[in-house]
């Protein structure tokens, strides 16, 4: 019976761990008086359903939980291809707003997160995200 060198086994395990587990994605931007953070557990996104979340915080860092959060995610038109454009409402879960994005193809996508609070001006944050 052949023995597999320990070093080779360690390299194979390291490669499987590094490439088998997708890293998350988190990007924070400021829109008006709000800090809006888009989070993805699995990044890059995959073709099909993806779960994302949005955290909205005011200038003092307190979570905003009384807003209506809508998300537009889209791929701009390219030569020979029409644009793809989708809209969804995020649902409050704890102190974050969650939504599902069904991405039909790989490539560069854009997301616009719009936050509307009672008695306050609307705020929109823009993000670039990739799908593979």
For the regions a protein language model found, what residue spans apply to each?
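Sec-dependent bacterial lipoprotein signal peptides
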Residues: 1-19
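Contiguous segments within soluble domain cores/interaction surfaces
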Residues: 21-132
């Amino acid at each position: 019976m052949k023995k597999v060198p320990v070093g080779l086994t360690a390299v194979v395990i390291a490669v499987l761990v590094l490439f088998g587990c997708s890293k998350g994605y988190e990007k924070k931007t400021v829109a008006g008086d709000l800090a809006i953070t888009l989070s993805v557990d699995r990044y890059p996104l995959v073709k099909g359903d993806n779960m994302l979340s949005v955290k909205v915080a005011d200038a003092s860092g307190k979570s905003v939980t009384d807003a209506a959060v809508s998300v537009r995610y889209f791929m701009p038109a390219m030569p020979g291809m029409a644009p793809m454009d989708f809209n969804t409402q995020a649902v409050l879960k704890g102190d974050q707003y969650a939504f599902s994005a069904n991405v039909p193809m790989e490539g560069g996508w854009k997301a616009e997160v719009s936050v509307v609070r009672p008695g306050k001006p609307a705020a929109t944050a823009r993000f670039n995200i990739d799908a593979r």
